[in-house]
């Protein structure tokens, strides 16, 4: 019955778990090397970070890219967000450029494509739709664009064109990296 599936799954997962205990350190080493490259490459690192984060969204693996930077110790202890908030008054009162005060802050700019790119995507799709379909297309796209801008959730809008025009999605990822860098 249905309990056989659970029992078989448990038994099969034991050797797979042991296997991953052996091979996961290699994956972790690759992730650490990527983080080292991104933090040490300056503007190129920010570009690669943002482009890679956008490209990985359909797989859900984008969390491996941004979480260590925004909330973890990849750039500063405690993450960029935890560093930014207590220092915001200092940044606001300084006459120095922000890039001198907080050079690691460039990694926080991955959200720029959510604020500016997603409304542009929605408008481009809307105006390229046939006139008789624009009302229906707009009713799908404009709420998705508003959610992207206000909440940072871009998947509904990006998945709207990802499977129809994957090359445009790749261009979107490259432009997002360029906007952040």
Regions inferred by a protein language model and the residue ranges of each:
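Generic preference for flexible, low-structure residues
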Residues: 16, 64, 68-77, 141, ...
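Membrane-embedded translocation segments of transport machinery
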Residues: 44-117, 123-131
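Signature of multi-pass transmembrane helix bundles
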Residues: 1-58, 65-70, 181
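Membrane-embedded transport cores of multi-pass solute transporters
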Residues: 1-10, 19, 94-181
């Amino acid at each position: 019955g249905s309990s056989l599936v659970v029992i078989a799954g448990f038994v099969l997962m034991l050797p797979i778990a042991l296997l991953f205990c052996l091979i996961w350190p290699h994956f972790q080493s690759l992730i650490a090397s990527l983080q080292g490259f991104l933090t040490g490459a300056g503007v190129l690192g920010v570009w690669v970070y943002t482009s890679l984060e956008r490209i990985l969204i359909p797989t859900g693996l984008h969390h491996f890219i941004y979480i260590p930077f925004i909330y973890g110790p990849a750039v500063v202890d405690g993450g960029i967000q935890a560093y930014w908030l207590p220092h915001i008054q200092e940044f606001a009162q300084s006459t120095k450029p922000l890039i001198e005060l907080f050079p690691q802050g460039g990694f926080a700019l991955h959200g720029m494509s959510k604020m500016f790119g997603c409304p542009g995507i929605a408008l481009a799709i809307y105006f390229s739709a046939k006139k008789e379909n624009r009302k229906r297309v707009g009713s799908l796209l404009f709420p998705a664009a508003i959610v992207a801008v206000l909440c940072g959730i871009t998947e509904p809008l990006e998945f709207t064109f990802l499977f129809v025009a994957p090359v445009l999605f790749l261009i979107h990822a490259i432009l997002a990296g360029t906007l952040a860098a």
